[in-house]
Amino acid sequence: VYIRKKENVFMTKIIKRPWGSYIVIAKSKDYLLKKITVKPEGVLSYQSHNFRSEHWIIIEGKATIILNNRTYYKSANEHIFIPKKAKHRVLNESLKKKLVIVEVQTGSKFLESDIKRFSDIYGRSK
């Protein structure tokens, strides 16, 4: 289901991934807003983006974030900035609780193909 209002696009379709899922909440030429849910023990690939930076706000759970080989621990109401071209990943190390992140992407392109994977536990690295 898509609802269009001026340049914003609101989507209610849940996109499934091996680590969990995401929903695109809003998109314009200047930003893309996602709600990301990482299942218990889920791990996103160690990746970078050429055309976008990301702001992650932790909504629920505890995130272990690897940013350029440095580890950060973030909980609800905390945030981190991921500059474009920075290598990064997030892990949900909980055995039972989900991790929920609001991601704000800024940059010149917001494409799922703008992912360079360096490692991935689900076999998706190139």
Q: Which stretches of residues belong to each language-model region?
A:
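Glycine- and acidic-residue-biased ligand/ion/polar-headgroup-sensing regions
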Residues: 51-64, 68-69
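Double-stranded beta-helix
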Residues: 12-16, 89-126
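A generic "binding-loop/recognition-motif" signal
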Residues: 42, 51-52, 70, 86-87, ...
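Short proline/glycine- and basic residue-enriched helix-capping loop/turn segments at helix->loop/beta transitions
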Residues: 37
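Short acidic-glycine-tyrosine-enriched beta hairpin
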Residues: 69-87
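A short, N-terminal "cap"/entry segment at the start of jelly-roll beta-barrel domains
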Residues: 1-34, 43-46, 115-126
